[in-house]
């Protein structure tokens, strides 16, 4: 039985010359767990908004075709009624949290519908989402993962047949991401809910989903069982989707070396153990260490930071933190949600002040610096690029700080930055209306406009497809010609292992590990303690040989390949 059907669905946003959706025909069976994949801008979110009636009832435009959800025609049914059929959790889920306490928020939708059992429905939704016992907590006491689960509980309280989640784990560490997907699995298998996720993380799709829907240019390419879908490596990559790393490695081995393996291509590490079993013993090799840096750019000296909650309870973020960042380093700060990564950055740019201790730039205390001086030392690019846009055009945003400070030649400098970040053709467009990758490039141009010595980036690759990630990766490499020291806070372990020459691991406001990628990921106890997870291909290598330390598909192929000169090839590749 189909719970969702679309017939020739075509939709134009107001004023658009090209459709966001083109003749979409789809059937989704009741009880399915469907992942929707596709490049940024292919129409995934637009399609999902058509399922719960936001399009066309709330977001106007030209709507053609028919959408049926649990027997209701969305064009002839109001959004309030459809919300009880298809619950939606947005990518920016924090905007769905409306009430101060957990139970209050979970039951709020039911209260709006004047349901007499609103509190019971809220409690049941919290129980199903694993938040039992949190009913009286304030929402700001929750972790990022718990807040996401609360948004899900709010949608679930109306007891819809369909639950739609847009990028549910984009801002979460692996432990919180696992918890979200385990809850979704329970809702699907135990409560027979139909789950639809928009997702870039194909390793989670492989572990949890039943079918995959590929979209491109507003059209449906295909809907296939997950095992078959993720084996279409070339097709997925052409659409800027990362298949699981184990699948890419197997595909390349079969294509380049004629390795057959067992059965089809693996999509999980467990399947990979069988496929890669016939491989030869790995070549032993070491990655060259980066040149040792001596000069200190910034130092945290016995820094403590705490605050009191609304209940008057003290909460400590950092206690006697000591940390030095050297000039010229590429540093990745990692750790679970709530570990203190973003707070560390806010302290560095002066948005927060330490309760105790000091932060020094070139040996000079931050407390004695005015904002003009500090902004020349350090700049921060926020996780949400939209927060960087305050003017009507990209060019005006890039020029803003320089113009405000009377920087000589700021117009010429603006043109240089627009050209360097490939923004010249977009200079007169509103930054808020650009694509994901374009927004990131624009926010980076704004961040380095004053030529800071240190650049801080918070989650620079969140929610991005392959093409946009590669774009940002290239931009990060270009940073060495622009700014001296770069520090990123991220959950993206592929980026960490490919880019950083030093990794700092935070847990509960403490530095529990600090070193190279081998020193960090080679210590299983530490990474479990920190709630982080290495790239999937690292786990695949470890499953085949406990001494194997490979962080990219290329390194895996060189490590386990048959080339006699693999050691030389490897060194050439990583330098």
Give the ranges of each region predicted by the language model.
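Conserved catalytic motifs of ABC-family nucleotide-binding domains
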Residues: 159, 451
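Catalytic Walker B motif of ABC-type/P-loop ATPase nucleotide-binding domains
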Residues: 163-166, 455-458
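Conserved ABC transporter NBD signature motif
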Residues: 60-72, 357-365, 374
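Conserved ABC ATPase signature
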Residues: 138-142, 146, 430-434
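Conserved ABC ATPase "signature" region
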Residues: 117-134, 408-426
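Conserved ABC ATPase "signature" C-loop
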Residues: 217-218, 508-509
């Amino acid at each position: 039985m189909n719970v969702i059907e679309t017939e020739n669905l075509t939709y134009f946003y107001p004023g658009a010359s090209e459709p966001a959706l083109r003749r979409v025909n789809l059937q989704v069976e009741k009880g399915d767990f469907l992942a929707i994949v596709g490049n940024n801008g292919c129409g995934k979110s637009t399609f999902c908004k058509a399922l719960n009636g936001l399009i066309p009832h709330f977001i106007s435009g030209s709507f053609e075709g028919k959408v049926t959800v649990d027997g209701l025609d969305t064009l002839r049914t109001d959004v309030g009624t459809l919300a009880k059929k298809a619950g939606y959790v947005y990518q920016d889920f924090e905007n769905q949290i409306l009430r101060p306490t957990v139970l209050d928020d979970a039951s709020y939708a039911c209260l709006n519908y004047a349901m007499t059992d609103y509190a019971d429905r809220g409690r049941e939704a919290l129980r199903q989402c694993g938040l039992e016992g949190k009913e009286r907590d304030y929402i700001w006491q929750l972790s990022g993962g718990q807040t996401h689960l609360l948004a899900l509980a709010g949608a679930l309280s109306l007891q819809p047949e369909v639950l739609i989640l847009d990028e549910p784990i984009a801002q979460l560490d692996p432990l919180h991401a696992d918890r979200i997907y385990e809850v979704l699995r329970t809702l699907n298998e135990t409560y027979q809910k139909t789950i639809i996720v928009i997702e870039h993380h194909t390793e989670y799709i492989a572990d949890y989903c039943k079918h995959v829907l590929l979209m491109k240019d507003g059209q449906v390419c295909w809907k296939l069982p997950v095992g078959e879908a993720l084996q279409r490596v070339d097709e997925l990559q052409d659409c800027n989707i990362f298949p699981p790393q184990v699948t890419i490695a197997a595909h390349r081995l079969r294509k380049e070396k004629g390795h057959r393996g067992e059965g089809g291509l693996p999509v999980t590490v467990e399947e990979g153990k069988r496929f890669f079993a016939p491989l030869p013993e790995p070549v032993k090799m070491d990655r060259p260490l980066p040149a040792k840096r001596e000069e200190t750019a910034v130092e945290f000296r016995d820094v403590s930071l705490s605050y009191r909650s609304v209940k008057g309870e003290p909460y400590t973020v950092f206690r006697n933190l000591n940390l030095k960042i050297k000039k010229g380093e590429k540093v990745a700060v990692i750790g679970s949600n709530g570990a203190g990564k973003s707070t560390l950055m806010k302290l560095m740019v002066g948005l927060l002040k330490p309760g105790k201790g000091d932060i020094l730039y070139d040996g000079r205390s931050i407390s004695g610096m005015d904002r003009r001086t500090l902004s020349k030392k350090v700049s921060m690019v926020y996780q949400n690029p939209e927060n960087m846009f305050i003017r009507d055009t990209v060019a005006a945003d890039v020029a803003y700080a320089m113009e405000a400070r009377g920087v000589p030649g700021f117009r010429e400098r603006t043109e240089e930055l627009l050209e360097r970040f490939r923004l010249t053709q977009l200079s007169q467009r509103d930054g808020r209306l650009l694509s994901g990758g374009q927004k990131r490039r624009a926010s980076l141009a704004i961040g380095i406009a004053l030529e800071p010595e240190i650049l801080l980036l918070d989650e620079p690759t969140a929610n991005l497809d392959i093409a946009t990630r590669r774009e940002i990766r290239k931009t990060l490499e270009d940073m060495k010609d622009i700014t001296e020291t770069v520090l990123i806070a991220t959950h993206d372990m592929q980026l960490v292992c490919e880019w950083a020459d030093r990794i700092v691991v935070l847990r509960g406001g403490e530095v529990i590990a600090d070193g190279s990628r081998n020193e960090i990921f080679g210590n299983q106890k530490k990474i479990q303690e920190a709630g982080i997870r290495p790239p999937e291909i690292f786990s695949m290598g470890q499953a085949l040989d406990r001494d194997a330390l490979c962080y990219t598909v290329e390194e895996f192929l060189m490590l386990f390949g048959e080339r006699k000169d693999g050691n030389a090839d490897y060194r050439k590749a990583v330098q």
